Amino acid sequence: MSVEEFRQVIDIDLNAPFIMSKAVIPGMIKKGHGKIINICSMMSELGRETVSAYAAAKGGLKMLTRNICSEFGEHNIQCNGIGPGYIATPQTAPLRELQADGSRHPFDRFIISKTPAARWGTPDDLMGPAVFLASDASDFVNGHILYVDGGILAYIGKQP
């Protein structure tokens, strides 16, 4: 990965949420409340080959989320994050396609075998947590990252 590619990932996955937060927080302070939901990632908890920039950006976003909570919580602003696990999207489709011999892609087998839910997540799996974090029911939830990962972090965390 080049330095420019690294910077681009940081710009999209860390700097953009920071800039968005700076833009909306003054209005939230004036209004007396607000909710920010950042899309973090389970990769903020893991070190994995080939995802250094992404993991660094999402780790930074996790800490930005917690710091916005600390800095602006007194203004009744909640800042939380959703940490998706492996989600079935068009971007991950090549990893879920059957091989020419009819077998599953090795990464697909890995995800299914290591995720206690035994499946990839779907975008729909993220809707309920987002609705909860945006609702009044989460008014006392602040600075939290809600991992929606089918349990893979718990499973990987217990491995030797």
Question: What residue spans do the PLM features occupy?
Answer:
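Active-site loop immediately N-terminal to the catalytic Tyr-X3-Lys motif
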Residues: 46-52, 74-75, 118, 136
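C-terminal helical subdomain
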Residues: 81, 104-137, 141, 150
